[in-house]
């Protein structure tokens, strides 16, 4: 299998080591009943809404993860951060900036209407300090807010272009919380 490519010219996947059939079987029925197995392997073939549905399903299975020694964790769950990175990158337009951090202040302000009652800049900087439920709420909100948009906006340049890497760093601690 080829390595994951993170450019708009090349489809993302397959992710080495990820058992796509097992991933498909692990997704909640609300997701798996509305997608095909090839949809998981090629984010370019699905709509924005389907990408969001798949990402929500991945957050669900990350939240309900088995022990790290379980075969399911080894074949599926440990690959979820990289898988989400690829799908979110395609959802946002394929231009991905792995080398820079999101603008925490701008992102914090963007989250105020939905998560302002509890989110702090400290949580955004250190996602491992959030509870399992808080991480899930943040990931769900990112998916809800995500959309392909013009690349010439401040929000795109400072937040969304860098979001796939940030999302990956947030979902990772979720896999290790009980």
Swiss-Prot record:
Per the record, the domain of life is Viruses
Q: What is its main location?
A: host cell
Q: What keywords tag this UniProt record?
A: Host cytoplasm
Presence of keyword Metal-binding: no
Signal peptide from the UniProt entry: none
Biological role: Induces the formation of large intracellular inclusion body, organized in amorphous and crystalline arrays. Presumably the main cause of the stripe disease observed in host.
Query: What is the recorded name of this protein?
Result: Major non-capsid protein
* Natural source organism: Rice stripe virus (isolate T)
Instruction: Give the organism's phylogenetic lineage.
Output: Viruses, Riboviria, Orthornavirae, Negarnaviricota, Polyploviricotina
């Amino acid at each position: 299998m080829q390595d994951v490519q993170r450019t708009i010219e090349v489809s993302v996947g397959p992710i080495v080591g990820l058992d796509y059939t097992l991933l498909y079987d692990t997704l909640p029925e609300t997701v798996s009943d509305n997608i095909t197995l090839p949809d998981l392997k090629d984010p370019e073939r699905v709509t924005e809404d389907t990408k969001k549905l798949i990402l929500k399903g991945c957050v669900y299975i990350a939240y309900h993860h088995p022990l790290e020694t379980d075969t399911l964790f080894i074949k599926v769950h440990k690959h979820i951060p990289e898988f989400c990175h690829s799908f979110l990158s395609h959802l946002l337009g394929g231009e991905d900036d792995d080398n820079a951090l999101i603008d925490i202040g701008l992102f914090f302000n963007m989250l105020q209407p939905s998560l302002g009652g509890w989110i702090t800049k400290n949580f955004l900087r250190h996602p491992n300090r959030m509870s399992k439920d808080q991480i899930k709420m943040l990931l769900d909100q990112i998916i809800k807010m995500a959309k392909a948009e013009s690349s010439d906006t401040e929000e795109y340049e400072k937040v969304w272009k860098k979001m796939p890497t940030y999302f990956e760093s947030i979902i990772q601690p979720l896999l290790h919380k009980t």
